[in-house]
């Protein structure tokens, strides 16, 4: 923007614009000018590029051309949607003064700020996906995180002990807008997100945050929410609430509580695992062939969003999980799915409609949809009374007969889009409104009578009475008969083929009608606002009802999925382990044209690591992923694709599957692989489910084998996690003989001549060969290359036999090297301890104790 020192040289209109822009420097300012929203200077250039609209000039101001871009006011929603998707924020500046009485530019002010994370307009929101805004506050190596869903009022905080935990949580919630303190040190953690907003440090002050939150909730302290000790989270929440109020320019009555999310409540899943398991997004970035695509047949958008929340945040509370299972079982036994789903479909997106009611931005059709939703509640409750388990469920939905009656009386069946268009409030709701309308609507009959009378009086058969916004009512006569116009006709407008006139009687009636229309619209707007006043005291009950109905939709949906897809109810055990009989991959079995080959998996304290061998394309990755997905499905309360399943306690799910480099960060495939493996080795426990696929590639054979061997040993002996370990290092199949708890399984295949058939069935024991050349032939590698490879393979096998001692002792060498490394580490530790000792300060007793300790370290 041009320098502000020329401010006094600008036109009055541009002075007004620059003043408002200075108050909103970090957002695009949509400045209302008649039927357009216009942008100037740098905003115009940016908007023209982002929206692909023309960049023009609006005359001059302060002696300089003014760059300008604009969009029609009636098309603004489409442009806002595009900007929001790009992570931009927009201030909407409207004319609030009356042009007739204004001296100079019409008074304007910013009425709302649309940001990606605080938007509530239906047209700007993804229907089946949460739209979250988050705030990060860092103190040393710890982080406070606050997350708000403006469209539901759900407000949560959490405290994270390290950067890895923060990254995992951000990947889970996928905020569309992210606020951060200007003092944030680890900015690389957030660089990949859109909608980044840097906030001043004072907005994160704890005392201010507590004061803001207590004022929002009408409380004296925050103890009732259980968040008072989460200091870092509260600092983030204070900044977030302040930002939400700043952008909405109104009260936020739908934000009625705040909760603390703790990692111990959920099964932890890191970003890599979410990606590898393709929970809601596939590896190509789409939504097809994901777990959510298979499980989500919910009939309401709010149900779909809740199900995705469950998928990304499996819970560890067995009581809650069994509660969900029991309700699914009851729905199936009572055959209520077909009864409930049509009723729930009519409920629609009640959750987001209520948010717009709270913000007083609900449109007329929102209120008709809310009315339809409330009409379904008695019928839904009637169905629920058939099942004793659902009595408590039904009791969470209050009696809304008064609010329903209000909406039935107040709003017509098919209202226009906007209240400003009028015709929204039903006839008979307000007597004064009916009177103004009758006067306004009686104009048609009066004007028709006047037109017939004037034709008779003048003898002009082409005489017509019309209206336009510029000249109001007029009498129109063709040019051929204009000479017959009486003397009291006052010419108002001359066109090519007609003359237009006004008479005192018509002018008087015009004023009367326009007054009636204006009064009617003003009163209708007032009555519309009063409907909000009557609904808002019941907002908490309405929100609870919408959440209950969303949960009912999810449970009904999971019941339908269980019946349609032949899922079974899993059992939970207090013993660590998994026992899945004939498990199936929930996504792959729906995509395959041929029958899916089901396979068992058994992991327990005596069998906690399976070495999986077999050919590429044999199904190793599918087998591992299906185990993780079945476990995850059990921990959201869903039935699972298996003949039976017993699931023990699980605290985390880890995967090291697939190969990809990270060019943006300059990390090779091997570096990415090792980083993920390091995370697993540091974080996994004996209650973790770990999937490892082909660790140790991307380096020399001995390096890779050594790493794979050491990782398997660590997982089996030290961590004792439940691990599926797929590998092409056949030397690792000797591990079960050396380490307790490791077992071999393999995916079967059958080779005949030059072809191979994959059996996809899991068998005990190690695979006999890798079938690599057969798979290469299937992939279309030219026959001459395959032939050459076979010859080379024979040479290598002959060479291997000649060096049989070396070949047979590879594993022994690896084990020896690792043992030597351990001894070196122990020796190093002893040396470091000796360096710190001062013999002159040790008593004889202390010296003897120290000697025993050093001896123990060496052993």
Curated annotation (Swiss-Prot):
Keywords: ATP-binding, DNA damage, DNA repair, DNA-binding, Nucleotide-binding. GO terms for biological process: mismatch repair. CDD domains: ABC_MutS1. ATP binds at residues 614-621. One of its GO terms (molecular function) is ATP binding. PROSITE patterns: DNA_MISMATCH_REPAIR_2 (PS00486). It holds the Pfam family MutS_III. This protein is involved in the repair of mismatches in DNA. It is possible that it carries out the mismatch recognition step. This protein has a weak ATPase activity. The lineage of its organism: Bacteria, Pseudomonadati, Pseudomonadota, Gammaproteobacteria, Pasteurellales. The gene is mutS. InterPro entries: DNA_mismatch_repair_MutS, DNA_mismatch_repair_MutS-lik_N, DNA_mismatch_repair_MutS/MSH, DNA_mismatch_repair_MutS_C, DNA_mismatch_repair_MutS_clamp, DNA_mismatch_repair_MutS_core, DNA_mismatch_repair_MutS_N, DNA_mismatch_repair_MutS_sf. The keyword DNA repair applies. The keyword Nucleus does not apply. Disulfide bonds: none annotated. This is DNA mismatch repair protein MutS. GO terms for cellular component: cytosol. It comes from the Bacteria. Belongs to the DNA mismatch repair MutS family.
